[in-house]
Design a protein with these regions (language model features):
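Beta-lactam-recognizing serine transpeptidase/beta-lactamase-like catalytic domain environment
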Residues: 2-6, 81, 203-216, 255-300, ...
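Periplasmic/cell-envelope proteins involved in peptidoglycan metabolism and beta-lactam response
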Residues: 1-279, 295, 370-382, 504, ...
Length: 661
């Protein structure tokens, strides 16, 4: 039987632990376990939302689904601004391997140098970073084909402006977030923008979408904006102004074309301009919509309102005489002068035709200042045009209670107040019809568009633009008889020997008034000029009103008859042909006075009563007509492929001078 083996008892087991030590160890373990339980409870309760959000950030993402921004269209449906599909390229910078050779190809496709790309990926402590926004789809597909870990893309839209600088001041532009910054894009931001949708998705480590979490919230697209603009006439006006500014070495220029029947704006052109799709061309000078925001003294173009007030009062007729033979007129300590001294008495009609400051001032001072102010206020002087456009200027027209006699006199011929070109174009609507001032319109209301669309459909698909040409009722300002008389006076004024070959439009009777004013700087007039011409055609039934302004011509001439009248002729001729308006006069004509009694001085030719207002064929400088385009030429050059109205001028002298031409 084997012997039993004795084992030595471990000393540690034989030792008796002190009671306080065992209790301490138990308490320590209890506290540690309790802390773990409390922490677990805290994480499952108070910190649960935070932890879930942090976890979701690593695999969940809410993608904003952009609404398709509404289009901006002209009256015929031609697109002036639209949104095209594009992609935004982004990266999780902490997941991108900076040594990956494919980053060189990525930089090339993004139009960046590799150093700039690496700087974007390493800049700051941000994990998510946009590399480039609004990348075209073809480039985005080639980037996706690189399959670089950590690089992804989202769908978005890129704003497109097919007309470029031609309609830039009208449509404006948006920023990268599709928020309007200028023009109609800014003014109608809420209408055009719509409401974005959303999509919650799960992504993998490379940023690729695995699945959707919730139901997709669809975006609500923005509504289209339809303008009264005719893009063909807009192009013609833009090119005419641009070329005139270059030819006259001017600072800037603008033109407005209105439908004489309803006040709708057919064109609103400015130069200098900018390309809304290329932000590198943006600068303060090019951004200014001068036809609406820039103010100037209208000069002689305002004299017709003084004449209209005089005629409408019943105290004067077109044959009423005014003495301006001295060439100057003292009003207290002040003196006003005519640019050219007149040797004979002037009829009211001749006061406008010869642009006499003295005759106009005498006319105005014979009437109460309140009546004069009410006339100017009624046609919109001193009030911002309500066309829904940002920054439309109100101009300056002091209350008549503060007018001194000299101020009343100077206001009568367009000094001492300020206007915008659009205000003046709208004011001339009282002469185009029955004496009513028409509201200027730029936006075709959506309700009217729906009604017109139904009418067009009922007519079997007639041209959409035709439905918006109906005449509208305005606010009466002068009697219809006065408006008719003023049309004759405007026709005589535009047909005088100073302007016949500059403002004339072959085949059409035109009427209008030139203006030439010095600019006011620091409270004093300086030798910088604004040349203008405002007129309408055809005078048998006015269809368009065209206003032209050239700022600071620098090629030696500055009279409105020299600078602005030819631009008026070109725009008016092309617009009338585009609108298919029938000619109302022979190609070589000069108008006769309104009636035999208005002819003052030797050489008068009496006519039969039935000949009043009839056009007579007489010998005048020939005009060569090159038929203008009915639409915009497809060439992008300003000098090629664009038919134009060419007028050859012979033996012409400048129009009347200071205070108006």
């Amino acid at each position: 039987m084997p012997k039993s083996v004795k084992f030595a008892a471990p000393h540690l087991l034989q030792a008796r632990l002190q009671l306080w030590r065992s209790r301490f160890m138990f308490a320590l373990l209890f506290v540690a376990f309790s802390a773990l339980c409390i922490k677990a409870f805290y994480l499952q309760t108070a910190s649960k939302p935070f932890l879930q959000a942090q976890g979701a950030q690593r695999y969940e993402k809410t993608i904003e689904l952009q609404a398709n921004r509404g289009r901006i269209l002209d009256r015929h449906g031609v697109v002036l601004a639209s949104s095209l599909p594009a992609r935004s390229i982004w990266a999780y910078a902490d997941r991108v391997d900076l040594s990956d050779p494919r980053l060189m190809d990525l930089a090339r496709l993004l139009g960046m140098n590799p150093q700039d790309l690496q700087a974007k990926l390493t800049h700051g402590d941000r994990s998510f970073v946009f590399l480039k926004r609004q990348v075209d789809l073809d480039t985005a597909e080639r980037i996706a084909a690189l399959r670089i870990h950590g690089i992804g893309q989202d769908s978005e839209y890129k704003r497109n402006y097919p007309e470029g600088e031609i309609a830039a001041h009208l449509v404006g532009f948006t920023d990268l977030a599709h928020v309007g910054q200028e023009g109609l894009e800014l003014a109608f931001q809420s209408t055009l923008a719509g409401k974005p949708g959303s999509r919650r998705v799960v992504r993998d480590g490379s940023g690729r979408i695995i699945s959707d979490i919730d139901q997709i919230k669809e975006p609500q697209d923005g509504r289209d904006l339809k303008l009264t603009i005719d893009s063909r006439i807009q192009y013609q006006a833009f090119q005419a102004v641009k070329e005139a500014v270059a030819a006259q070495q001017a600072k800037a220029g603008a033109a407005v074309v209105l439908d004489a029947r309803n006040g709708q704006i057919l064109a609103l052109a400015n130069w200098p301009s900018y390309n809304p799709a290329d932000r590198r061309t943006l600068n303060g000078n090019g951004l200014r919509n001068r036809a609406i925001t820039d103010l100037y003294e209208p000069g002689s173009t305002l004299k017709v309102f003084t004449a209209a007030l005089a005629l409408d009062s019943g105290r004067y007729s077109p044959s009423s005489l005014f003495d301006a033979r001295e060439g100057f007129m003292k009003i207290g300590p002040d003196v006003i002068r005519d640019a050219h001294r007149n040797k004979e008495l002037l009829t009211l009609q001749q006061v406008i035709q010869k642009s006499s400051n003295i005759g106009t001032a005498k006319m105005a001072l014979s009437m109460p200042p309140e009546d004069h102010w009410k006339m100017l206020d009624a046609v919109g002087i001193g009030q911002a045009p309500r066309i829904g456009f940002p920054g439309a200027a109100a101009g300056r027209l002091r209350p008549y209670t503060k007018w001194k006699p000299i101020e009343h006199a100077t206001i009568s011929y367009g000094h001492g107040l300020s206007v915008s070109l659009l205000q003046m174009a709208r004011a001339y609507t009282i002469f185009a019809g029955g004496g009513e001032v028409l509201p200027a319109q730029l936006i075709i209301p959506e309700e009217e568009r729906r009604v017109r669309a139904i009418q067009v459909s009922a007519r079997g698909g007639a041209a959409l633009g035709a439905g918006f040409n109906a005449p509208v009722r305005g606010t009466p300002v002068i009697r219809p008889q006065t408006a008719a008389t003023m049309r004759h006076i405007l026709e005589m004024s535009a047909g005088n020997k100073d302007a016949v070959s500059r403002a004339a439009v072959p085949g059409y009777r035109i009427g209008g008034k030139t203006g030439t004013t010095k600019k006011l700087e620091g409270g004093r007039y300086v030798k910088k000029y604004v040349s203008s011409f405002i007129g309408m055609a055809p005078m048998s039934n006015p269809r368009v009103i065209v206003a032209v302004m050239i700022d600071e011509p620098g090629a030696g001439k500055y009279y409105g008859s020299d600078i602005a009248a030819p631009v008026f002729a070109r725009i008016t001729g092309e617009a009338l042909h585009t609108l298919a308006v029938e000619p109302d006069a022979p190609f070589e004509t000069m108008i006769s006075p309104i009636s035999p009694e208005l002819v003052v001085g030797p050489g008068s030719v009496p006519r039969a009563p039935g000949d009043v207002g009839r056009v007579q064929n007489v010998s005048v400088p020939r005009h060569t007509l090159i038929p203008p385009a009915k639409g915009r030429p497809k060439t992008s050059s300003a000098d090629e492929g664009k038919p134009r109205l060419a007028v050859r001028q012979e033996n012409e002298r400048p129009g009347s001078g200071r205070g108006g031409a």
